[in-house]
Each structure stands twice: as structure tokens, then as C-alpha cells.
């Protein structure tokens, strides 16, 4: 401390000199390439009276707006900040025209509690003592959360002379800071072509359009721009691709609101979103759908028909799903088909040349997946150009009635959820969230939102859905167990409930409980069509009880699910089949349902199972990653509640501090419950307390640390004291939500647990506290696109390991087991359902820290059989010895039993064949066979060494294999 201050100040001359040095190098760049970079660049009228000071991409929009306004005689300009730190006051002042009478500073950030945002404060300080010292300086916020900033909003800034502090892009009806914005302006250069593509997350639309804009930019004399707008769902969400190209530079850093070409890649969107209304008169609309003329007449909403007819829209259709099936691409990968159709209709490049370039791009993009995949894409490109059909628009469409769009709406349910859905979620899911005012969020300022709102979405995104045939069902409940989205559920109905069920519902007598009728409820509109359920169904005599059939043919059956899933849980059924079993657990409501996870996701079945076992008393701290995205994709929340209103309390802090965050949640519970425990003791020891109250207090205190029984004891305690004339009792009842022992979980992926958050995970496990860590091990950073982590095995190809990872996978389980007092398990659901349930139940019951590492197949693996076979892939991983299932339970050692159990059998099957079944490995074999042979051999040997080591643990802890 005696020298720190001086040492820090010694560098001042270097910072003081830096602006001049940067300008010197800018001058050299300018000389070489003809640019005009300065520390602060001015653009606009030479005699400007109102200047905006800003930095970043918004400056292009401001420049485009300035061109429009200056042409109309306005005296406006912009100063673009090129070097923010060190901030050169002299350079800023020199950049501002002498004629300026007002300055508006735009900041793309919010600093609550400050007198202004950073750039504004710097500008005010820089102007002090200059010739602009008395010039009014206004400050505005814009663009938070990627909020669109349009020319009309920039005009509002220039017209503002009253609000010294303001916002643009929103309607602030709470603090009234927002500026009124006029009608949308068209400020793009003449001849600019605007195209917008509406796709379904994971259908390839975004990837295809990235290729399209590269093709246009690289093979024409046009400038090109692309921007992709989509929600945070892992797949199945709405994607919008905005493409612009033209002969002049494009400065439009905002979304397209009027397009020359609009493509809808999912037919259900025509009933949900305003798409054709975005077209200019005479524009082109391409719809991917299976409908002929009669089908279009039946399915197109009246307002869509009327707009097409009255605005001279050229209308085309193509059946991308049919072409996808015919070419082997499958029903969901329609991207190259629609891309080919776009190039044919847009006529930017001659058709033959466009097809040639698309095929080259497809080879570059998919070549690592094999020649077969490339050939299918080429066939899809050819057919996409051939099978477009122009629709002759009937004259009658001009007078078609406006029927309104289908929107999310809640008519029943919990009051908090209904309010949230109808005021916020419905708008957001209809792509109208930008229209919501600030006041809509007045009840949610702390970031808390209601649980269970994903159930109101009913997206209907699957092409095919499971259809249940009771004749072939053995009531094993495996389909429900593996379903990533909780859309298929076994339901036990009483005779009265079965009689009251909607007509046509499929049922069968319930095995082992003759007083009940069994049905398999399927939510078609929440299904993603992955097919995992049908894949694992054992059926009878080789015939499965589940078949994947067209959603359109079974959409009307949604009412069966809505009825059955709303029936009360049968506690006697759960008791009969035991909740800690595969079958029994599925009779409990999943408290994670209808998430935004990918079809076939390997992570959500584990999380869903945990909520079925402990969800009514769970706290979850979730690391940023896939599990936080499917765990809470605003505005819909898939974590939900049971009929008592109990469910997981979920929160996400950051990526790197999640373990510490979860640990903090645990300590907070401990402190709160400790205070309540003391009060319960006071009540029990009171001479005035009735015996039944004392008994309830004693039961609560006796079960205080037992999560399995303390919940029931808590209910008895609250019931016993709720009407007591006692201040202490009233305080206990007031805080009843904190009374019961909670099940504290920490969720995250391998990128968090093995890499960035490892220090925190290690700290929490070392603490000895009763806390559970669940690692969804996909062996890559899944959420950010498949980067290598320390969980990535030798030879796997991933980002940052494009040539195959040279080093072996980190042995996280062994590190945790080295403490000796941490429960550790490795599981793979598809390999051993029972072991997965047992490990999760044991981990939660263990009175100390636990770590579960769950193998989770991911789309980044490139499973050649497809994600419908994710559970099969888990089975093969264990069967071949690639993954090992085991449990280390220190509590057993205290009982004189073996603490270690190796659940996996000795490896069998072809290890190399397993590796070659996934693109992440096979692509290396295609690119560099010799290297692949070396690394794959190393990978296999490492797997054998792991199994040898695990067998040594079996002997060390004194059990037979």
C-alpha cells in the first residue's frame, strides 16, 4: 500500500500521449486505403445546429437519417466516437461545428442511480471551459437488449428540445422519459432490396441465409447486409432473417419493416404473425406449405388473402417438407430447398449460376458430415428451384374478412400466471413485445416471473407426433421417462374421471390397480416431434405402442391431454409403484414442462426427473448455458407447480459464479430456517401451548433435516398453529414457505463445471454442506455452438479443436471422490433407467455434498441416427465402454458397506464404430484419416484405462464387480 498509488500514477504520460499516437496510425491507414478515420469523425451539415454524439453501429443509422434530413434542409449532424479511452477533449471539441446550438449524447447503457451515462458525463466534462460550455447537452438511452433503433427515432432526437434526459425505442409511461416517435421513414438508398425470412429454430433457415448473403456479396457488384433476429429457445422458436443488398453502401443498422420479398418457412405462422403486411406493394411472398388451391382457401386467414389481393403481391408456394422427405433431408431440414426457391424468384443471380454457388456452399458447410449429406443437399437445391408454384390470386380475396390472428391467451389457471400471460407473454409470442409500455413491467421490477407459463404457448411446431395404441402398451412408462419436453404422461383415472373424459379418449385397464383406468396423455401442440418416446417403446411382440404420425391428423386430440393432465395426482398409485422407480416416478407431475430445448435433448429428461422426485421443495441455481436457456426463455417459464402451488424456485446468476450462487442460496435457507426453528422451539416449550401444538412442533423439529418427511411435518405444524392467538405463531405462519427442508440443486453444463466454474464447484463440494450439483455433460460448450471444454474427449472435433482434441477428458468424478465425503455418480439414462433414478435419489438423500455427472447427447455431436436415437446413443456409449456408470456413496462406508458400486457391465461392442456414428469424430476421420486413427486409438485406450481404474476402486472398497 505504501507504493501502489505512486506506481499507478507513473503511467499517466503514456495515457496522455496515446490519442496522438492513435491518430498518427489512423492517418497512415487513411493514406493507404483512402479512409478518413479520426478520433472523432463528424458527418452532416457544415452549418449544423443540432449534433448527436454517439459511438458504435447506431452511427450508421444516424448518418442515413442525416442524409434524409439534410436533403430536406435540416441542419443536423453526428460526431462519431472512434477512440473512447483515453478520451481526448481537444479532439472532440475540434470535431463539433462552430454553429452548433444543441448537443444530444446517446448511450447504449443504463447506470441506475447515476447522474448520467458514461459517454454523456465524459462529453459534459470535455465541454467544460470550451467554446461549447454553455451549449445545452441532452442525454438519451437507446438500444438496450438490442432494441431496434430506427431513423424515425433519430428524427425524434433531433426534434427534441424539451426533455434533457430521454429514451428512444420504447414507450415509458412510468417515468415519462421516452420521446414521441413519428411514422416510420424510408431512408435506405434507392434500389436497395429488402428481404425477410420467417423460419423455425433449427430448421436451417438462418444458416441458409448466411450462405445466401455471402453468395450475393461475393458474386455480384452489390453491397450486402444480413441480420438475424430470434428468441433464446434452443430450437423451435421463431427466427427472422433480414437481408439487404443494393448498389450503394448499406447503413441501415435496424430491422426490415418493409420488404420486397418475404418468405414464410412454417405454414402455421400465417395464422400467428403479421408477415404479408410487411411487403411493399407488388412484393413477393413465398409460403412453404402442403396446401393446394383448396387448402390455401381453407387455411389462409382473411386478412392475409385481402392484403395479397389488394396490394398486388406475387404469391408462390412450395412444399418443402415433401421435398425434404423425397430427397432424404427429412421433414425438418428445409433450408436449402427454400434457399434455392428464393434465388429463383429473386433473380439476383442467373438461376444456373445460383444453383452452382449454392451447391459449392453446401459442400463447404456440410462436407465434414459426409458425401451422402452433401448429395442430399444438392438434390434438395435442384428440387427447390423446380417445384415452386405460382398462385393465381382469386378476385374474391380482395373482400376476404379479417378473422384476426391466433394468439397466446390464458383463460384459466393461477391468477399470477394468467395476468402475466395475457399482459406480457401473449404480446411477446405474437412478435409484438416491442409495443409493450414500461408500465406493463411494474409488477416485475425485481426480475421475478410466474412459474408454468410455457404451458400456455401451445406452439404446434412438430411435423409428426406420437400416437398411442393401448393394445401394444405394457404400461412401463419409459416413453414418459425419456421425453425431453414432458408432453407424454401416464395418467391413472378413477371410474368417474374416465366416464367424464372427452369422447374418443384411448384407455385401458390399469395393471396392478384394477380400480383405475390407464391412459397415455400426449400434448400434440407442445411436442417437438423428436421421436424419443417411440424409439424406447418396447411394445408387445415387436409392435410398438407409439407411432409417429402427422400433427395435422391428430391436433384435435389435444383435448384429451388437457383433460387428463389436469386430473389430481393419485398418491396411492405413486405409493404402489414407488416414486423412486422408473414407472412410479412418472405418475408424479413433471414440474419442468414444454421447455425450449432442442428436439431429442439429452439434458432435460434428467432435469424433468429431478423435478418429479423433489420439485415441490426444490431450489435451483442454474449456470448460464443450455440449461438456463431452456430453463427460462423469456417470456415463458417451463418450471411449474403442482396442484398445491409448490414447485422449483429457479434463478440464474452468471456463468462463472453459479456454484457460489447456489451455495449462497443454501446458506440463506439455513439462516432463515434457523430463526424459525428457534421460534418453533419457543412454542413447543411454552406452557400455554396445547398438546396437539406441542406434538406438531416436536414432529417438525425431529424431521428438521430430513427433506423427505419434513414437508409433511411442516404442513401439520402450520395447520396446528394457523389460528393461534400468539405473535410467534403468526410470524411462523407468515414465513411458512421457508419452514420445510428444501432440496438445494445447482445445475449447469460441462463448460461451467469442468472449466469456467470449476473453482466454485470444488469449493462447494469441499464445504461438506448438504447440496446437490447436477452436471449435464455434453462434452462441449453446447449453448455457444460447440466449443471444446475440458470434458471434450480425445479426438473429438469441436470449435477450438478443429483438428481433433489432443488431450484427454478431465476426470471430474475422481477429483470429487478424492474428498472421501462427497457423493459422486455418473449416469446415462438411456443405458440404465433404474441406475439413473437410484443415483439421483441417493444423491438427494445423502446428508452432504453430491455430484451427479449425466451423459447428455447433443445436436453438436452430430449423431448420424438423429436425435430421436439420443437414448440409444447413451446405451451404446455405456455398452462400448465410452461412458461408465457408477455410484460412490460415503454413507454406506459408515454402515460397514462398500461405498463404491460400478453399475456398468464390462464393455462389449465395437468402440470405433460408436465413434464413427457421430460427426464430431467421423469428420476427423474424413479430413485426416491418419490423425483420426491415432487419436481414436488413444481415446479407446483411455476408456479402457478408466474402466480398469474403476475396477480397482471396486476392489479397494471391498465389493465384487
Give the residues covered by each predicted segment.
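Active-site cofactor/cluster-binding pocket
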Residues: 86-91, 99-102, 106-117, 191-201, ...
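Conserved phosphate/anionic-ligand binding catalytic regions in large, soluble enzymes, centered on
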Residues: 195-215, 329-341, 475, 480-481, ...
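Conformationally flexible catalytic loops at phosphate/diphosphate-handling active centers
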Residues: 1-41, 860, 872-901
